[in-house]
Amino acid sequence: MKNKKKFVIFAHSGTYDKLYQIVTLAITAASMGRETYIFLFFWALRRFVNEEFDFKRLSSEFGSEGERLAKRMQEINPISLKEILQEVRGMGNLKIYACTAAVKIMELEESLVKSKVDDIL
């Protein structure tokens, strides 16, 4: 990943709508040939490490409106965020990093985090 334009995403929030935006921004930038970096903090880090990308959580995050959206998404049956991320990572120009302090603050197991990201910084 040298001599290419770079695209950096700093992700803090772990709500589905924010995770969706992170993934769509990453796939767009990577598809355009940019070196793409995602830096994970706090709830985004927790959801990523625990692979909690399910849109069904919308109902608990956004009440009745989230329930309606989750039902609609179930009907549409979109490709999962996890699958999209795997595809983007396969392109070779996406790196995902975890914040050292956030790993400790969120009480995440360091070995598990290391197995899900490119590095802990």
Task: Give residue spans per PLM region.
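Extreme N-terminal starter segment of soluble prokaryotic enzymes
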Residues: 4-8
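Short, glycine-rich nucleotide/cofactor-binding loops
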Residues: 9-20, 48-49
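Histidine-anchored nucleotide/phosphate-binding helix
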Residues: 20-32, 38
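Short internal beta-strands
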Residues: 36-42, 97-99
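Short beta-alpha junction loops
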Residues: 42-46, 102-103
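N-terminal beta-loop-helix "entrance" segment that forms/cooperates
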Residues: 45-57
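A glycine-rich helix N-cap at a beta->alpha junction
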Residues: 56-90
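A charged, amphipathic interaction segment
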Residues: 80-121
